[in-house]
Structure formats: structure tokens, C-alpha cells
């Protein structure tokens, strides 16, 4: 009798797990190849593909929730979202508030330049130049020190599209952003006459963060993500997301 009761409890527990919803946040600031957003809905990109595969492996239903960066803390605390990715503990003033996933992949801060200008290959070449940057972002220590000393001029903008327009008008010498979004941009729009410079300003690892109301144990989420790193799934998703969309 006890064995039957235990079996019934296990079955019920499995059924509840499959019925649970995983609420996956996505930042509109990430852009492609990470997020493809139409009318505030996540239509494609790496983040969507990653969320779908993780939810499938965990046996959870899935809902994507648009989450501006300034809303992450509140959404996590309220359970409005359970997880959001493309983050790094070094960017958070209180990283201990969250559980951080294993590192999923590496990103780099690099420069976008006009093709008709000499490629910037060394940090010293930035002296006296104006760089387009993201409002409120903190960059590598040597770059932040150069900004503070006035050796390099910082021009904050709200998004990459604004920096691209300023580059086209020669109001910037270069724009700073993550490598993959810049590669995606230059591949999709060669007519812009822009390219990614060889100089790497900073390299860092990207993680997911989990809130306290995650519908599965954090160990389960960590295990699935770690398996996807080890079996090459993460790398393949990233590479696929960088490719040009197929014609209908």
C-alpha cells in the first residue's frame, strides 16, 4: 500500500512539473543575433532557441517576457520572470542576490568602424578619438580610465542603431558593442560600409541568472545548461543565429 501511494505521488509530481511554466526574460537591448523582437514579442534569435530547448529538456511550458534592464531586479523578486540570460556577475552591484548559471559562452567588446577609415588595431590608437557607447554601461578598466582622463571622448547613446547613424555621419570614430551583434549587423547590411576592427577591448563570459521562484531546482537548470555547453548545443545555436534569415 505504501509503495502504491509513493508511486502515485511520484506520478502526480511529474505531472505537476510538466504543467509548470518557466518564465524566461529577454532584454530588448540585446538585439540580434540574441533577440528578434516584433511588437514586444520574442520571435527569434539565440535567446528564444535557448529557452525553447531548456524548457523542453526540463519538461516545462515556456513563456517569454520582455524585460528592460532596469526591470530585471523587480521582475525577479516578484516572480514575473524566473530566468534571464546574457549577463555577467561583474555587471551586477549585488551578484549574490541571484544564482548564476555555469558560463555559457564568451563575448567581447569590440569596435565598429567605417570601411573608409584605417582599422584600429591597438588601444593607443584610440587616444583623441570619440567612441559611441551605451548609456550607463561600464567598460574595461583601461577604457574607463581613459574616458575619465579625457584621453578618449565618450559619446553615450541609447542603442546600437543610434551609434550606427552617428558613424555614418562621421560624428564618431568608432562604436563599442559586443562582437556578435556587430558581426550580425555587418553581415546583414554590407551596404552600410561598416566593419568590426581587430582590437578586442574586453572579453567576458556570459551567464543566466535565476530568481528565487524558479519552478525547478537550480541544480536541474544548471545541469541542463552545462550539458548544452558540453555537447556543443550552445555553440551551434549561436552560430545558427548569426546566419542570414532564410527567404520565405
Where are the model-predicted features located?
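Periplasmic-binding protein-like
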Residues: 27-30, 106-110, 187-226, 244-248
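A ligand-binding cleft/hinge motif common to bilobed small-molecule-binding domains
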Residues: 74, 86-96, 145, 173-202
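Ligand-binding clefts/hinges and TM-proximal coupling segments of bilobed small-molecule sensing domains
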Residues: 61, 138-152, 194, 226-248
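N-terminal signal peptide c-region/cleavage motif recognized by signal peptidases
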Residues: 14-15
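Short helices/loops that flank or line small-molecule/ion binding pockets
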Residues: 65, 70-82, 99, 124-125, ...
Amino acid at each position: 500500500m505504501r509503495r502504491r501511494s509513493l508511486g502515485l505521488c511520484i506520478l502526480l509530481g511529474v505531472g505537476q512539473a510538466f504543467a509548470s511554466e518557466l518564465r524566461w526574460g529577454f532584454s530588448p537591448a540585446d538585439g540580434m543575433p540574441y533577440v528578434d523582437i516584433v511588437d514586444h514579442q520574442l520571435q527569434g534569435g539565440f535567446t528564444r532557441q535557448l529557452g525553447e530547448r531548456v524548457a523542453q529538456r526540463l519538461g516545462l511550458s515556456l513563456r517569454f517576457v520582455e524585460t528592460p534592464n532596469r526591470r530585471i531586479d523587480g521582475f525577479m523578486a516578484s516572480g514575473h520572470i524566473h530566468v534571464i540570460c546574457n549577463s555577467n556577475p561583474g555587471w551586477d552591484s549585488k551578484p549574490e542576490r541571484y544564482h548564476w548559471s555555469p558560463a555559457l559562452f564568451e563575448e567581447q567588446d569590440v569596435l565598429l568602424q567605417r570601411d573608409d577609415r584605417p582599422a584600429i588595431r591597438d588601444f593607443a590608437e584610440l587616444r583623441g578619438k570619440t567612441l559611441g557607447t551605451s548609456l550607463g554601461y561600464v567598460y574595461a578598466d583601461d577604457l574607463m580610465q581613459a574616458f575619465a582622463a579625457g584621453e578618449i571622448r565618450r559619446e553615450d547613446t541609447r542603442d546600437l542603431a543610434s551609434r550606427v547613424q552617428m558613424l555614418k555621419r562621421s560624428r564618431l570614430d568608432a562604436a563599442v558593442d559586443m562582437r556578435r551583434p556587430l558581426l550580425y549587423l555587418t553581415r546583414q547590411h554590407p551596404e552600410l560600409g561598416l566593419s568590426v576592427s581587430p582590437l578586442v577591448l574586453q572579453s567576458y563570459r556570459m551567464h543566466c541568472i535565476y530568481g528565487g521562484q524558479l519552478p525547478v531546482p537550480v541544480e536541474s537548470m544548471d545541469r541542463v545548461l552545462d550539458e548544452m555547453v558540453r555537447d556543443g548545443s550552445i555553440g551551434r545555436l549561436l552560430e545558427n543565429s548569426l546566419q542570414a534569415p532564410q527567404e520565405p
